[in-house]
Amino acid sequence: MLASSRSFTRKRPWRVCRWIHSPATPRLNSVNQHDLAHFAKILAPSSILSTLPPTSLPPAELDQYNNDWMGKYHGSSNTVLKPRTTQEVSEIVKWCWDKRIGVVPQGGNTSLVGGSVPLNDEVIISLTNMSKVRSFDPISGYFYCCCPCTCCKFK
């Protein structure tokens, strides 16, 4: 027998409470100095931003990565990595997988739902250094570009 149409129109409880007191996942590890030393073998020194030693930046330096552009969601990551190639991204993700470190990929950080903002102390992989327009077809109007390209690149 079919359920009444009333049951389908009833409001469902909203269970999304991602930003309300999200405890750290006990199965994930935090970034430490050993991890930063490994990332330094993969990336240029200017591509590693961290509040941990040896770089020890002030936390305010990471605010643009820990907060969405609307100021609605706020994260608490202490490390931002800015790879330039897909090979570097691959090596970072492999290391984080092996060491059970959480990762948050971040393109242009233009998300309206907070998907690019870390919940806890995950590593942010900022893809801004990969922002390139590879080609443009003037006949069709199509751009072929890398992932973090935003509309302002096309002007």
How should these model regions be labeled?
Residues M1-K155:
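Noncatalytic alpha-helical scaffold of FAD-dependent oxidoreductases
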